C-alpha cells in the first residue's frame, strides 16, 4: 500500500502544471536586464539588443546590433523553451555569445520574465 501511495504521489508531482506566469513579477525580474537590454515603445539597442518581439524571432537578427558570430550562426528561433535554456546559462546554450550574465536559475522568475517579454510586439507596443 505504501508503494502505491508513493507511486501516486510521484505521478502527481510529475504531471503538475508548470509555474504560472506573472508579467508584473516578470517586470521586476527584467530590472536586472535593463543594464544591457531595453523593451517597449522607444526601445533602443544598448550593450544587448532590443527584446521587443523576441519570441518567434531568429537569434542575431535585430538590425543595428553587432551580434557575435555565435549568436548570428546559432540557428536558434526564440521559443519559450529555448529562452528558458538560454537565460539559465547563456554561455552553455550559445557558446561564444557576448552576453555576460550568470543566468536566472529560479524557475518561477524565468516564467515571470517570459510573461513580461511576451507582452511586447516587435514595434514595442503591448499585445
Swiss-Prot record:
The lineage's top-level taxon is Bacteria
One of the record's GO molecular function terms: metal ion binding
Q: Which SUPFAM superfamilies match?
A: Cytochrome c (SSF46626)
Binding-site list for heme c: 33, 36-37, 99
Positions of post-translational Pyrrolidone carboxylic acid modification: 21
Q: Which UniProt keywords apply?
A: Electron transport, Heme, Iron, Metal-binding, Photosynthesis, Pyrrolidone carboxylic acid, Signal, Transport
Pfam families reported in the protein's UniProt record: Cytochrom_C (PF00034)
Q: How is it modified after translation?
A: Binds 1 heme c group covalently per subunit.
Signal peptide location in the record?
Answer: 1-20
User: Quick one: a GO biological-process term for this protein?
Assistant: photosynthesis
**Job description of the protein:** Cytochrome c2 is found mainly in purple, non-sulfur, photosynthetic bacteria where it functions as the electron donor to the oxidized bacteriochlorophyll in the photophosphorylation pathway. However, it may also have a role in the respiratory chain and is found in some non-photosynthetic bacteria.
Which PANTHER family does the protein's record reference? Answer: CYTOCHROME C
Q: Which family does it belong to?
A: Belongs to the cytochrome c family.
The protein's name: Cytochrome c2
**Which lineage ranks, top first, belong to the organism behind this chain?**
Bacteria, Pseudomonadati, Pseudomonadota, Alphaproteobacteria, Hyphomicrobiales
Amino acid at each position: 500500500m505504501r508503494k502505491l501511495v508513493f507511486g501516486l504521489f510521484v505521478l502527481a508531482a510529475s504531471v503538475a502544471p508548470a509555474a504560472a506566469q506573472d508579467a508584473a513579477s516578470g517586470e521586476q525580474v527584467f530590472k536586472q536586464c535593463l543594464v544591457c537590454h531595453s523593451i517597449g515603445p522607444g526601445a533602443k539597442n544598448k550593450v544587448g539588443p532590443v527584446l521587443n518581439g523576441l519570441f518567434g524571432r531568429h537569434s542575431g537578427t535585430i538590425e543595428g546590433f553587432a551580434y557575435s558570430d555565435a549568436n548570428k550562426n546559432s540557428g536558434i528561433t526564440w521559443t519559450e523553451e529555448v529562452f528558458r535554456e538560454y537565460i539559465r546559462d547563456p554561455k552553455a546554450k550559445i557558446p561564444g555569445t557576448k552576453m555576460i550574465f550568470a543566468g536566472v536559475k529560479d524557475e518561477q522568475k524565468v516564467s515571470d520574465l517570459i510573461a513580461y517579454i511576451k507582452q511586447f510586439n516587435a514595434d514595442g507596443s503591448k499585445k
